[in-house]
Amino acid sequence: ARRQRQMCIRDSRCAETAIITFMTFKELNITEPILKAIEEKGYAVPTPIQGEAIPAALAKRDILGCAQTGTGKTASFAIPIIQHLQMNKEAAKCRGIKALILKPTRELALQISECINDYSKYTQVRHGVIFGGVNQRPQVDMLHKGIDILVATPGRLLDLMNQGHIHLDKIQYFVLDEADRMLD
């Protein structure tokens, strides 16, 4: 027997609640290149946070997600962002950062960047990571080559924005990850 879960999505813009039953990532309408990457990581069934957040994000809804460490929060936002950028031909033509993911520390930013790399490896979506405590020249060079998704720590983001290396006028997706730790 296949494992089934149900979820309710409430949209603040309307009074209706949708009940969706799903079983696998494929049934969440993830595109083939991303599905292949997910399967290579050994995942078949979405976690509860993924099962709720991915369909809502694919429907272009705002998400406020709270879950314990290790429950798949990163995939909950990374997969829909990658898929939207991969499928949006207009976005592909437009140079500039289209998704910004803020993380409080270098270590967490690097972890997210690795996950994005894993999920996007069969797509044309380009990403990069910036953080302080290292020479900024390689990061600036990467930015100038062009990326779609930027993972950043706040300090380095502000530094490179103030120096004119980062422009956020093309941003379509914003993720504030570990928001509680940003305030520490």
Task: Say what each PLM segment does.
Residues 1-11:
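Single conserved hydrophobic/aromatic residue that forms the stacking wall/gate
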Residues 10-19:
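Short, positively charged and aromatic/hydrophobic N-terminal segments
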Residues 22-66:
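Conserved pre-motif I regulatory segment
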Residues 27, 33-36, 40, 92-162, ...:
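Conserved nucleic-acid-binding Ia/Ib motif block in the N-terminal RecA-like helicase ATPase lobe
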Residues 54-63, 75-92, 117-118, 158:
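Walker A/P-loop NTP-binding motif
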Residues 67-71:
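The conserved Walker
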Residues 167-168, 172-184:
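Post-DEXD/H (motif II) to motif III coupling segment of the RecA-like Helicase ATP-binding lobe
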